[in-house]
């Protein structure tokens, strides 16, 4: 049996597509999300589905320990769980900022903390953090969200440097516009309408599986090759 893959936020969109790709390659999976029924509905073989909020580190550690007891050490963690709540700083509900930083930044740190000690001890392992083009440049209405994704880029690169001597890899995947549920949680209808119009102007956006294929490409390199970052976007996406 191939090595264990842990994926957060796997109940839809990019996380679901990544889960399907790794399952097709024969990997056992630990899938975590708040909507566990969506995970179970994927009906993937050799898969443990756990209801976990990534902001709850203890629950995440418990789920990983349970999966490792069944499938062996986690060889890869895909930190995919994320929230995108767009808005102008002067009008946006401050609770939305906190929710994004809790999930996108602290949740990511919780995931890395949960697996890194074991990876360093084994001198092997890969962490793949799903960030965004919004972690490389700014966009209107994205101030707080960009802040979280710039943090993901900084954390990923810093930790990559720290664990490189232990033969552990850290990769950042930075997608542009992707067809997922992320935008649906934004409360401003004007912002959502503008985003939808932008997607039409581009002639369409990335599919979740486009991002999943980038993840697989990075992971399937030999362990002595670390793809530090992949940025991908629709060809017609200018910013």
Protein language model regions, located:
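Active-site helix of classical SDR
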Residues: 112, 148
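The beta1-alpha1 cofactor-binding region of Rossmann-like NAD(H)/NADP(H)-dependent oxidoreductases
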Residues: 52-62, 94
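C-terminal helical subdomain
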Residues: 172-173, 193-234, 238
